[in-house]
């Protein structure tokens, strides 16, 4: 790899980490600062959510019932304009200070040449999400 390639991968990984930190902070606008206007969120097996404003609404709808969120990063690695995350997404729905939902997730992020997230795909067990209190992800 070249120095330019290493710099780009590090920048892209930093953008994804900043996006996920926005989740930990429950800060929709911090998340949105890392994405393009035409971003696409694909949450298997649901329909794709297209456009920054629609993704903003989806994230806000998930934040609303959550008292605390933590996306625990297990692995993050990049290649070119792609970043993959292996995570444990943890959710406290009732403010008890304990995690009612611990969800293993793999996320795939595609970034533009200037380091903005343009596509975000998530892979996890949707039944586990629903069983432990996850809100509907349909707009």
Give the residues covered by each predicted segment.
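Short, low-complexity N-terminal intrinsically disordered segments enriched in polar/charged residues
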Residues: 1-34, 138-139
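A beta-strand edge to alpha-helix "cap/lid" segment located at domain peripheries
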Residues: 2-11, 56-139
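Structured beta->alpha junctions
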Residues: 20, 47, 75-77
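Short solvent-exposed beta->alpha transition segments
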Residues: 41-60
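Short, surface-exposed helix-loop/turn micro-motifs enriched in polar/charged residues
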Residues: 31, 47, 99-101
